[in-house]
């Protein structure tokens, strides 16, 4: 699902807000979450999951075109850990054949 598809679904299922209002709310939420992670903070949405940063150590990679070894710097990457309710719901839907 893309961001625009999410906006359409929310507007369709809930008739009180306009498409522009929903779009602004989602963009604002995503921007705040991005800023939070950029400063090293953790985000927890109970029942859904948590977002945090994981450190990837420096390593030697390989250029897929040339096969040449390339040194890669260490970096932080966003990580999502689903909450119990989300895991249960996904598995419940899977068991029903969805």
From Swiss-Prot:
Source domain of life: Bacteria
Q: Which residues cross the membrane?
A: none
Q: Which SUPFAM superfamilies match?
A: IHF-like DNA-binding proteins
Instruction: Give the matching SMART domains.
Output: BHL
Record's PROSITE patterns? HISTONE_LIKE
One cellular component (GO) term of this entry: chromosome
Which GO biological process categories is it annotated with?
DNA recombination; regulation of DNA-templated transcription; regulation of translation
Which keywords has UniProt assigned to this entry?
DNA recombination, DNA-binding, Transcription, Transcription regulation, Translation regulation
GO terms assigned for molecular function: DNA binding; structural constituent of chromatin
Query: What exactly does this protein do?
Result: This protein is one of the two subunits of integration host factor, a specific DNA-binding protein that functions in genetic recombination as well as in transcriptional and translational control.
Family, per the entry?
Belongs to the bacterial histone-like protein family.
Q: How does it assemble?
A: Heterodimer of an alpha and a beta chain.
**What's the name of the protein?**
Integration host factor subunit beta
**What organism, scientifically named, is this protein from?**
Pseudomonas fluorescens (strain SBW25)
């Amino acid at each position: 699902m893309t961001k625009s598809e999410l906006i359409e679904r929310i507007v369709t299922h809930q008739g009180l807000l306009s498409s522009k209002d929903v779009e602004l709310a989602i963009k604002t939420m995503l921007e705040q979450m991005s800023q939070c992670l950029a400063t090293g903070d953790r985000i927890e949405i109970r029942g859904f999951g948590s977002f945090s940063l994981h450190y990837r150590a420096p390593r030697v990679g390989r250029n897929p075109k040339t096969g040449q070894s390339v040194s890669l710097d260490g970096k932080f990457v966003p990580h999502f850990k689903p909450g119990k309710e989300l895991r249960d719901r996904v598995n419940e839907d899977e068991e029903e054949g969805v």
